[in-house]
């Protein structure tokens, strides 16, 4: 009885190689990544092709050439010159600048209020702690749009008419058309004042770093705060005087029926600014409170044992350590405030969304306008995140 020899040589076919590769985690991971990219590219191509076909079918022009067209509408509040004869592109720029104005001023104000309320919630004073708690619970549980309507319809709209404006210090007037204040008029000498201010800020930073290294090496403190204040205030003021006071003010004057002169901040911006600031501050207050609670209690007890005043313990020991806990969630609140500024359309403030909506209605370029909205808000979010990540890295605890 004869036995046939069995060929045990491995098969080297394509199917065999593919099956073998799929059992290797490295090649399997590469395959899944390539497959995912192919699917995403195919989906994007399908969306683009389908959009192009539908636009062609409806005889709708595409592209961003419409931005050179005449706007044909006015914008109530603008940081740059704008008229109805300006282009759509300039109108969008006005909207972007107004959005940035709301975001920057709102973030700054909300941070200050949030820190004060957060620290106040931990106060040993029963009344202060309870008032701060009520503030947080009220604003945190109300939709931001309702807060905006409260300030716009419930506070600013019931102010007196312009002829009965409420007089405020520094020649300012408050009425239902907004806040009128003196308009600064700059002369050419203000350029030198600005340069002096930049030099003073840079010098203050250099001195602060030198003082930090000096204290780490010798233990001797240096009054950097008062030095910085003296530089930042004193040097520009000296240049301002030497330049012949290159700044005047156009002061608003109360007339029989209206105010003349000066500048006016409309009630729409004031409502949006106040609403977003107070609303976001309630969330920041909880972040601050949680960050302070996250600092070991022994740190404050040790500082108190050294004879530091409670306010000094909070300022010098607790808050610097709490910042490492506070900064990451604080970034989310800054992003939320920036995106919530799009609610300005509800009260007629000309932010990016409101201006873009007007342009969309006139031009019909819906896809392009939506793309501009997305790109602008995405860019603002990325820039905010990058800055906060950099700041978080600077505040991180460096181990030796």
Curated annotation (Swiss-Prot):
<keyword id="KW-0472">Membrane</keyword>
<keyword id="KW-1133">Transmembrane helix</keyword>
<feature type="transmembrane region" description="Helical">
    <location>
        <begin position="225"/>
        <end position="245"/>
    </location>
</feature>
<comment type="function">
    <text>Part of a binding-protein-dependent transport system for L-amino acids, affects the uptake as well as efflux of these amino acids. Probably responsible for the translocation of the substrate across the membrane.</text>
</comment>
<feature type="transmembrane region" description="Helical">
    <location>
        <begin position="340"/>
        <end position="360"/>
    </location>
</feature>
<feature type="transmembrane region" description="Helical">
    <location>
        <begin position="264"/>
        <end position="284"/>
    </location>
</feature>
<feature type="transmembrane region" description="Helical">
    <location>
        <begin position="100"/>
        <end position="120"/>
    </location>
</feature>
<dbReference type="InterPro" id="IPR035906">
    <property type="entry name" value="MetI-like_sf"/>
</dbReference>
<feature type="transmembrane region" description="Helical">
    <location>
        <begin position="188"/>
        <end position="208"/>
    </location>
</feature>
<feature type="transmembrane region" description="Helical">
    <location>
        <begin position="367"/>
        <end position="387"/>
    </location>
</feature>
<dbReference type="GO" id="GO:0022857">
    <property type="term" value="F:transmembrane transporter activity"/>
</dbReference>
<dbReference type="GO" id="GO:0043190">
    <property type="term" value="C:ATP-binding cassette (ABC) transporter complex"/>
</dbReference>
<protein>
    <recommendedName>
        <fullName>General L-amino acid transport system permease protein AapQ</fullName>
    </recommendedName>
</protein>
<keyword id="KW-0029">Amino-acid transport</keyword>
<feature type="transmembrane region" description="Helical">
    <location>
        <begin position="29"/>
        <end position="49"/>
    </location>
</feature>
<keyword id="KW-0997">Cell inner membrane</keyword>
<feature type="domain" description="ABC transmembrane type-1">
    <location>
        <begin position="96"/>
        <end position="388"/>
    </location>
</feature>
<feature type="transmembrane region" description="Helical">
    <location>
        <begin position="142"/>
        <end position="162"/>
    </location>
</feature>
<dbReference type="InterPro" id="IPR043429">
    <property type="entry name" value="ArtM/GltK/GlnP/TcyL/YhdX-like"/>
</dbReference>
<comment type="similarity">
    <text>Belongs to the binding-protein-dependent transport system permease family. HisMQ subfamily.</text>
</comment>
<keyword id="KW-0812">Transmembrane</keyword>
<keyword id="KW-0813">Transport</keyword>
<dbReference type="InterPro" id="IPR010065">
    <property type="entry name" value="AA_ABC_transptr_permease_3TM"/>
</dbReference>
<dbReference type="Pfam" id="PF00528">
    <property type="entry name" value="BPD_transp_1"/>
</dbReference>
<dbReference type="InterPro" id="IPR000515">
    <property type="entry name" value="MetI-like"/>
</dbReference>
<keyword id="KW-1003">Cell membrane</keyword>
<dbReference type="GO" id="GO:0006865">
    <property type="term" value="P:amino acid transport"/>
</dbReference>
């Amino acid at each position: 009885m004869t036995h046939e020899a069995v060929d045990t040589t491995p098969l080297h076919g394509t199917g065999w190689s593919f099956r073998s590769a799929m059992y290797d985690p490295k090649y399997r991971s590469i395959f899944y990544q390539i497959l995912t990219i192919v699917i995403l590219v195919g989906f994007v191509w399908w969306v683009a092709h389908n959009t192009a076909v539908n636009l062609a079918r409806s005889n709708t022009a595409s592209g961003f050439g419409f931005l050179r067209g005449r706007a044909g509408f006015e914008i109530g509040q603008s940081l740059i010159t704008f008229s109805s004869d300006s282009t759509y592109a300039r109108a969008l720029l006005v909207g972007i600048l107004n959005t940035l104005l709301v975001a920057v001023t709102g973030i700054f104000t909300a941070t200050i209020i949030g820190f004060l309320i957060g620290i106040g919630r931990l106060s040993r004073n029963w009344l202060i702690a309870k008032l701060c708690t009520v503030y947080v619970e009220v604003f945190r549980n109300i939709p931001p749009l309702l807060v905006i309507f409260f300030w716009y319809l419930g506070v600013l709209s019931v102010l007196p008419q312009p002829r009965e404006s409420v007089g405020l210090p520094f020649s300012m007037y408050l009425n239902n058309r907004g806040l009128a204040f003196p308009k600064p008029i700059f002369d050419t000498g203000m350029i030198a004042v600005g340069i002096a201010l930049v030099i003073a800020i840079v010098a203050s930073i250099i001195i602060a770093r030198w003082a930090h290294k000096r204290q780490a090496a010798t233990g001797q403190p240096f009054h950097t705060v008062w030095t910085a204040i003296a530089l930042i205030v004193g040097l520009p003021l000296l240049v301002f005087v030497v330049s012949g006071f290159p700044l005047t003010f156009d002061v608003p004057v109360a007339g029989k029926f209206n105010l003349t002169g000066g500048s006016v901040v409309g009630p729409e911006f004031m409502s949006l600014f106040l609403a977003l600031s107070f609303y976001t501050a309630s969330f920041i207050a909880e972040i601050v409170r949680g960050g302070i609670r996250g600092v070991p209690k022994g740190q404050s007890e040790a500082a108190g044992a050294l004879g530091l005043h409670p306010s000094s313990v909070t300022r010098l020991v607790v808050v610097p350590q709490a910042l490492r806990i506070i900064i990451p969630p604080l970034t989310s609140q800054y992003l939320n405030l920036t995106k919530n500024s799009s609610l300005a359309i509800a009260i007629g403030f000309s932010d990016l969304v409101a201006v873009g909506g007007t342009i969309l209605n006139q031009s019909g370029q819906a896809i392009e306008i939506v793309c501009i909205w997305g790109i602008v808000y995405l860019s603002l979010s990325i820039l905010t995140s990058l800055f906060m990540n950099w700041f978080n890295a600077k505040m991180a605890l460096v181990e030796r």
